[in-house]
From Swiss-Prot:
CDD domains: Ribosomal_L18_L5e. This is one of the proteins that bind and probably mediate the attachment of the 5S RNA into the large ribosomal subunit, where it forms part of the central protuberance. One of its GO terms (molecular function) is structural constituent of ribosome. This is Large ribosomal subunit protein uL18.
Length: 120
């Protein structure tokens, strides 16, 4: 019997492989992206101390989004997480795409964060 591969299992495998090399430090935290079908989430993580430094998602009340699962929502989340990171004094980060393809919502979040002032 042929079984269809599950996309999320393959994504988690890719993410685990990348996480062996990418770590966030107190000076340069890791910008992690999680994408669901209805929303997108981004958080800056200091892996040395195990602390989330800043976070933003399409569920935030500040954004007042009707649809959190599109490219425009990802762009606004990228701007918001960059604003929160800059307020806390972080300018350079490490981008962690979470095993997702750098395309669509993930790419627009990254581009918006770059345009808002984060360097990666």
């Amino acid at each position: 019997m042929i079984t269809k591969p599950i996309k999320n299992v393959a994504r988690k495998k890719r993410h685990a492989h990348v996480r062996r090399t990418i770590t966030g430090t107190p000076e340069r935290p890791r910008l992690n992206v999680f994408r669901s079908s209805k929303h997108i989430y981004a958080q800056l993580i200091d892996d040395v101390n195990g602390v989330t430094v800043a976070a933003a998602s399409s569920l935030d009340k500040e954004l007042k989004l009707e649809n959190g699962g599109n490219v425009e929502a990802a762009k606004k989340v990228g701007e918001l997480v960059a604003k929160r990171a800059l307020e806390k004094g972080y300018k350079t980060i490490v981008f962690d795409r979470g095993g997702y393809v750098y395309h669509g919502r993930v790419a627009s979040l990254a581009d918006a964060a770059r345009e808002a002032g984060l360097q990666f």
